[in-house]
């Protein structure tokens, strides 16, 4: 029997506000433990919350960008549970009436088809504190308690781990582009839980689901869902009874581990938050927020294809972050060679950024300098290989490429006469290579070209070298 997965994702995104959702404490990441706290976020007796207007604005903005309907009347609710990282013993969230409903994200499948993944709801809530487990015991840091979140709950429309990854990548790029969250998964500002079950292909009856936590990267998400799918299929095939449960992804051993049996909604005893009034959102406010939404990544990618003529794949990669998209667009316009700009950014520049673990905003050079480098290569002033060396220098120093070329004497040699002398000398000293070439070994020419480039320290024009080596070899 063939099975298919039924997957839904719950994504928590920390909002990029300066202060917490119900108090004036800073949301800055990385402070000394328990220094960004006050009576309100610690839940001390007599303290009263006050809803941060910017949080509501960001909730509306996210909803509009994700094609949701905005609930013009919504409220906050208490979710009651006891855990050390929850100082009030309840979390202020939204239960029955969230701020947004009924949206979707459109992803592109491997075969080029588009698929809509429904979004059931988006609700606002406060984050919990952070537990640090040591050999001596467990420590609690409440700096994160009260940091504003939106939780984006998808419908169970996802059928493969690969689709889940595409959905999360698209969601991350949208939230980053509208600047409601920095979406730094390594810092926990974008966290994803997955719900998965399996059913026979063609069936409409979902199986017993598991919730998976601790998936803090795209790779972890895909691996965890794949593992859990296989576990479910094996259990169902053997006739075992699956139970609804919460599991965590163990990265070190590449398995999911049981945490607890899954709670039900009534275990949390939700009821309206009495310290906060019902929230009324006007049409005027919604339209004001709508005007602040910039061009979204998929819209920008489509424009890049039409305007610059780059491949769709390039456009999708370049628009994953707005910093990269902006850098590309400025470089393409200034260099007047969009495809080459795309190649540099997706190739050598991305490789160097990964090696140094930096982002586009950390680069020491700007789009104008990269455009200048492209123009130097296109004009034949330097070769592509020399261009890579210049780029390495730009990464370290931030100097203009022209200055680097002049300082290091890297100008390309286009003098055919001078290059011909080197070619003749190389051929004369390597008779075996000529013999190999005559015997049909085409690689022998490449060997000779390499020797010429080495002799000229990479400064000879490669096109001229190739032409002259071929001409001289054929004369022999």
Curated annotation (Swiss-Prot):
Specify whether Nucleotide-binding is a keyword of the entry.
yes
Q: Which GO terms describe its biological process?
A: glutaminyl-tRNAGln biosynthesis via transamidation; translation
Its UniProt entry gives the catalysed reaction(s) as: L-glutamyl-tRNA(Gln) + L-glutamine + ATP + H2O = L-glutaminyl-tRNA(Gln) + L-glutamate + ADP + phosphate + H(+); L-aspartyl-tRNA(Asn) + L-glutamine + ATP + H2O = L-asparaginyl-tRNA(Asn) + L-glutamate + ADP + phosphate + 2 H(+)
SUPFAM superfamilies from the xrefs? GatB/YqeY motif, Glutamine synthetase/guanido kinase
Gene3D superfamilies in the record: 1.10.10.410, GatB domain, N-terminal subdomain (1.10.150.380)
Q: Which GO terms describe its molecular function?
A: asparaginyl-tRNA synthase (glutamine-hydrolyzing) activity; ATP binding; glutaminyl-tRNA synthase (glutamine-hydrolyzing) activity
Q: What class of enzyme is it?
A: ligase
**Enzyme Commission identifier(s):** 6.3.5.-
Q: Where is the signal peptide?
A: none
List UniProt keywords, sorted A-Z. ATP-binding, Ligase, Nucleotide-binding, Protein biosynthesis
Subunit arrangement? Heterotrimer of A, B and C subunits.
- Protein family per UniProt: Belongs to the GatB/GatE family. GatB subfamily.
Q: What does this protein do?
A: Allows the formation of correctly charged Asn-tRNA(Asn) or Gln-tRNA(Gln) through the transamidation of misacylated Asp-tRNA(Asn) or Glu-tRNA(Gln) in organisms which lack either or both of asparaginyl-tRNA or glutaminyl-tRNA synthetases. The reaction takes place in the presence of glutamine and ATP through an activated phospho-Asp-tRNA(Asn) or phospho-Glu-tRNA(Gln).
Q: What is this protein called?
A: Aspartyl/glutamyl-tRNA(Asn/Gln) amidotransferase subunit B
* Organism in which the protein naturally occurs: Clostridium botulinum (strain Okra / Type B1)
* Gene assigned in the entry: gatB
